[in-house]
């Protein structure tokens, strides 16, 4: 069985983010995971498109933007422009899940779907 290792930059020390990204790549991580939180769908707030855009050319790793936001369809094109390869959305975050998935695919991106078990 093949495994995909996708470390989240949410746990990175941003003072040395480039070094930590290189370390993940050197240790076999082909993906980087971006936990994007809006403070509404989930209580925390993290980073958005500017962080992804600033680092996507610094690595060959696949960029997975995990959108923990309300109505993620609003952000699909912006994350594509920022350098995302995959956009993962939450089933519970959207009234138009099928349309959001279609938009992600229309942008040429891969789709991930998260389901909250609670």
Where do the PLM segments sit?
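Conserved anion-binding
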Residues: 13-16, 58, 74-75, 84-118
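Hydrophobic faces of well-ordered beta-strands that scaffold small-molecule active sites
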Residues: 3-8, 32-34, 63-67, 87-89, ...
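Conserved, mostly hydrophobic/aromatic
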Residues: 17, 24, 35, 79
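Short, charge-patterned binding micro-sites
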Residues: 40-42, 68-71, 82
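A structural motif
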Residues: 26-31, 60, 84
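N-terminal amphipathic alpha-helix/helix-capping segment at the start of soluble metabolic enzymes
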Residues: 1-11, 18-19
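Glycine-rich, proline-tolerant flexible connector loops at the mouths of alpha/beta enzymes
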Residues: 32-49
């Amino acid at each position: 069985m093949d495994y995909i290792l996708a470390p989240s930059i949410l746990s990175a020390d941003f003072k040395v983010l480039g070094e930590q990204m290189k370390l993940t790549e050197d240790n076999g991580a082909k993906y980087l995971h971006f936990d994007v939180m809006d403070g509404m769908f989930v209580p925390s707030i993290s980073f958005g498109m500017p962080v992804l855009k600033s680092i996507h050319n610094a690595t060959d790793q696949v960029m997975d933007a995990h959108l923990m936001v309300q109505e993620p369809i609003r952000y699909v094109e912006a994350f594509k422009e920022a350098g995302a390869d995959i956009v993962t959305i939450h089933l519970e975050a959207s009234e138009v899940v099928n349309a959001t998935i279609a938009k992600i695919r229309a942008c040429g991106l891969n789709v991930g779907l998260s389901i909250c078990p609670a």
